[in-house]
Amino acid sequence: MTQRYLFTSESVTEGHPDKICDQISDTILDALLSQDPQSRVAAEVVVNTGLVLITGEITSQAQVNYVDLVRKKITEIGYTSAENGFCATSCAVLVALDEQSPDIAQGVNVAQESRQQLSDEALDRIGAGDQGIMFGFACNETPEFMPLPISLAHRMARKLAAVRKTHQLPYLRPDGKTQVTVIYEDGRPVGIDTILISTQHTPTIGEISDEAEVQAKIKQDLWTMVVQPVFSDLTVKPDQNTRFLVNPTGKFVIGGPQGDSGLTGRKIIVDTYGGYSRHGGGAFSGKDPTKVDRSAAYAARYVAKNIVAAGLAEKCEVQLSYAIGVARPVSIFVDTFGTGKIADERLLELVQQHFELRPAGMIQSFGLRHLPSDRGGRFYQDVAAYGHFGRPDLELPWEQTDKAALLQEALPKTLSGAVSV
């Protein structure tokens, strides 16, 4: 009997209050690492009507004008008029930063293995910045090895922002959310059940002032300018049975920080796999690479993606866990949900053999300290919106599949000939 079910994921635009905070936090990180790659950063941001608060702990030799960074980022996002309820030039910016705790720093500067002289390897000298668990995931539903629901939600959110910024739909304002419900049969996506877009907009559109007519205009424009282009190159498409919902409350004029306060780290499911995979709970934005919440989540994705790209599984989830001040993972767990071509225990052995999962090793392998300076002063702020994974537009080091050929060698000879990497 065919197993049929629905799965839903959401995304938000760069103008969503929480995403404003994520982007400001990572803009600060970019600026600090560009000048001082050894910066220790935990930058948290809060936004509300007319207010931006920067707080957290930073230890760095860099000289940064935080107020200027904030205003430039808010301008880039699109809040340039008081009519939006939040404006880059008029909002207040408060800065309340401390240095990193020396109790934490001592464990990160020199790892337990090195302090106790259990290992002399250079990569054992940087311990994890905190305890915690991190998950990475990959599946073969899309070319970028991401689940289809979150991939579609991100595509629509990016397109929604694009038609606003290019003035194709000039009545749109920066805040917006997208959501896609995908129909699955026997574990494979086969159709689209529901598409939902909530987008901030002006009270009137040209001479149209009636609320119902305004919403009808928005709905038609979004179908033509956003939904249809997003699905144009896909085999799974909406059909006559697909529900298309736009601003279901009736209107969305008040938005951004005026409508809701925002906070760094509140969109962790949007940042990752849209709920399709588990999440360890730690946010990414505003954290330097010694924070394993970020670097180990990137590494776990790298491991899972290479396993799927190698044809060793159709889907794969990797869990890593760390102790503060300890370089080596406390545990590694690999789960292929019954889709593995070889046993999960064998995959675990391959992960331990071929992947560097100590904080210093991950930082070095991906170049995490130097990516901002290597890419013109901005890197992390660009992954702070529209997902940290499955981003071919950004050439992310943890999205490489350079280990796939090596892993493929572990396939039984009867299977390896049927898989191409």
UniProtKB/Swiss-Prot annotation:
EC number: 2.5.1.6
Catalytic activity line of the entry: L-methionine + ATP + H2O = S-adenosyl-L-methionine + phosphate + diphosphate
Top-level lineage group: Bacteria
PROSITE patterns in the cross-refs: ADOMET_SYNTHASE_1 (PS00376), ADOMET_SYNTHASE_2 (PS00377)
GO molecular function, one term: ATP binding
Flexible loop: region residues: 100-110
Cofactor: Mg(2+); K(+)
Pfam families referenced in this protein's UniProt entry, alphabetically: S-AdoMet_synt_C (PF02773), S-AdoMet_synt_M (PF02772), S-AdoMet_synt_N (PF00438)
Recorded GO CC terms: cytoplasm
Signal peptide: none
Annotated compartments: Cytoplasm
Residue sites binding L-methionine per the record: E57, Q100, D260, K291
Subunit structure: Homotetramer; dimer of dimers.
Family label: Belongs to the AdoMet synthase family.
Protein name: S-adenosylmethionine synthase
